[in-house]
Each structure stands twice: as C-alpha cells, then as structure tokens.
A protein has these predicted regions:
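Short, glycine/acidic-enriched loop or turn micro-motifs at the edges of active sites
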Residues: 129, 205, 230
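Short acidic, Gly/Ser-rich segments with clustered Asp/Glu that frequently serve as metal-coordination loops
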Residues: 208-209, 229-235
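Conserved, mostly hydrophobic/aromatic
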Residues: 126, 227, 303
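Domain-core and long-helix interface of multi-subunit machines
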Residues: 178, 201-207
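Conserved active-site beta-strand-loop modules that form the wall/rim of enzyme catalytic pockets
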Residues: 220-226
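Alpha/beta catalytic barrel-like cores
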Residues: 1-122, 131-145, 149-160, 164, ...
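Short, charge-patterned binding micro-sites
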Residues: 166-171
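A general structural motif
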Residues: 179-184, 246
Length: 326
C-alpha cells in the first residue's frame, strides 16, 4: 500500500542529468536547426531519446520511493511552435504537420504510458505561463489552445487516466480582473474537451489567490492546485488582501478534486535568495496543514517538490519525514 502522502519530482533528476551518458527528457534545438533540411529528423531523434529516458527516470524514481513525476513540456522540440504551425518559417509545412501528429512515435508513447500505468506512476504536465486561457488577444488564445491541445494529445496517446493532469496559472488580469475572469470562463468552455478534461488551476503569486479561483473552479468544475509558496508570496504582492488561513482553505480545495474523482495535488517550495517568489534549493518543512490532510480530511495527496535540487530535495524530505516512505 502506498503512503497517504507522496512527493513528486519536477522534470529533471540532477544525478541522472550529470552522469555519462546523460539522462533527461528535454533535449531540444534552436529554431534555425529545425529549419535545416534534416531538422525534423533531428527533432524526432531527440524526441525518441527523451521518451526513452522517461523510462530510466521512472525506474530511478521507483527505486527511491518516488511515484509521481512532472513531465517536461520540451519532450518534442518546437512541437507547438506557432510560426512553424502557420508555415511562416522555412520548415517544410507537410513534414511539420506530420511531426505534430505524433503518429511517428505513437508506439513509443503507448509503451511508456503503459509502463507508467503498470508501475502506478503518476505523470503530470505544467505547461508554460505563456498559455493564457483568459487572453484578450485571439492569437494568444489560439496559441494556448495549440500548446495545451498537444500536451493533452501526448497523454491521450500514452493512455494516461484522469490523474494525469495539466496544471496552469490564471495568467494576466489585463487591468480588470472581473472582466478577465468572465472571459476566462467563457474561453475555457470553448476549448476542446480533451483539454478541459485535464486542465487544473493553480494559484499564483501576484494575480490569482485561492479565493479568486474557487468560484471559477466551482463554475467550471476544475480542480485547484494549492501552491504553498505562491500563497505566501501573494501576501507580499497584495498586502491589502486578507486571505483566509491555508488550513481553512483545504476543505474547498479538496472538494474541487473530490467532485472530479481525481487525486489531489499540491505544490510546495520555499523562498530562495532572489526576488520574492524565487525557489530555494531545498524544502526544509512540509506545512502541517498538508501533513494533516490524510487524517483530518481522509484524502491521500501528492505533493510536487518545486526545489532547485530536484530529487536531492525529495530524498532529504524522505529522511526528515520517514512516514512518507513505504
């Protein structure tokens, strides 16, 4: 039986990345290389190696009591490149369209998806912050649909279930949060079902606190990812806003997951040496209100460790909190 709280790895394993041969899932290339005559073939070769290394990373995780991992959004170089999609570059449009279908790597994606499912290894995505569901610009919104749609397509080909979510932020407020929230709701409902089925909403450090997104979640039936560091940073950037205590927010947050029958996921990090919001190398303390959830609210949860030292930070927390290890 798995422990009620499991810690998750974000995209990179520092140990595997530094070894020879190196293991990681985000080999990429500059656009100019992609535009060369053999650019698509090079992109495919790097993608195949990225997919192969996902299995190696899963195996390492399992050996070290890690059963949750965020996949990189850069497994496939330039997959959602807007200019290439719109045939505004030197890339052969027919070759690029075929590249975006992912049919050329369907077997490899199906195999790694089956492997993850067989190992009960949860995989998630956190697409980039340039994705703006509430965008004013139609082009920005269409770029968002393209990128999120390709993320969803990867999971669908892999055969991943509803626990394989895509976490996004609210984005900008465009000088009027109320109007933006209305537009966010409307444009979310315009998105393809494949995207809507996997999208979850995370609070951010400046624009959208948990209490801003609870009504959106309830209206659209979207789960909420509570980020502990963003919750703290929001107080710094919005000193006049009185947020409820994090402990008091747990019931409505957990309810958003219960309604969809998806395992709740949280993000934790701590302040680093840079600007407010910068992530530290390690996480020293898991908030008590998260540790209390399995007993207090009868829910198992996953916690993504957003620390710069990646798996090293998780192993240190396993030592500090031995109950988190099977």
């Amino acid at each position: 039986m798995s422990p009620p709280i499991q810690l998750g790895l974000c995209c990179l394993n520092t140990k595997l990345r530094s070894q020879k041969p190196t293991v990681f899932m985000s080999r990429s290339m500059i656009q100019k290389t992609m535009e060369d005559i053999d650019g698509i073939d090079i992109a495919k070769q790097r993608s195949f190696q990225n997919i192969k290394d996902i299995k190696t990373m899963i195996d390492w995780n399992i050996e070290n009591d890690i059963n949750v991992m965020r996949l990189s959004s850069n497994i496939f170089p330039h997959l959602s490149n807007w200019k290439m999609t719109k045939c505004e570059t030197m890339v052969d449009p027919i070759l690029f369209e075929e590249y975006q279908t992912l049919d050329w790597c369907r077997t490899e994606l199906e195999d790694i998806g089956k492997y993850a499912n067989d190992k009960k290894h949860r995989l998630t995505f956190h697409p980039g912050q340039y994705n703006q569901v509430g965008a004013q610009s139609r082009e920005v919104y269409e770029k968002t649909i393209l990128d999120l749609g390709l993320h969803a397509k990867i999971f669908d080909i892999m055969g991943m279930g509803p626990n394989s979510i895509m976490v996004i932020h609210g984005g900008g407020v465009y000088k009027n949060k109320g109007e933006t929230i209305d537009r966010w709701k409307r444009q979310f409902l315009e998105m393809p079902e494949a995207i809507r089925d996997r999208l979850v909403f995370e609070n951010c450090e400046k624009s959208y606190c948990i209490e801003d997104i609870i009504p959106i979640s309830e209206y659209l039936n979207i789960p909420i990812v509570h980020d502990t560091h963003h919750y703290t940073c929001f107080k710094h950037y919005n000193p006049t806003v009185n947020q409820k205590s994090a402990d008091d927010l747990m019931i409505p947050v957990l309810d958003t997951w219960r309604r969809r029958n998806i395992k709740p996921k949280f993000h934790i990090s701590e302040q680093g040496s840079g600007r407010v919001g910068h992530h530290s190398d390690f996480v020293e303390v898991i908030p008590k209100y998260l540790l209390d959830i399995p007993i207090k609210h009868n829910r198992d949860i996953d916690i993504m460790i957003e620390a710069k030292k990646k798996e090293q930070a998780i192993l240190r927390l396993h030592d500090k909190y031995p109950d988190l290890v099977e």
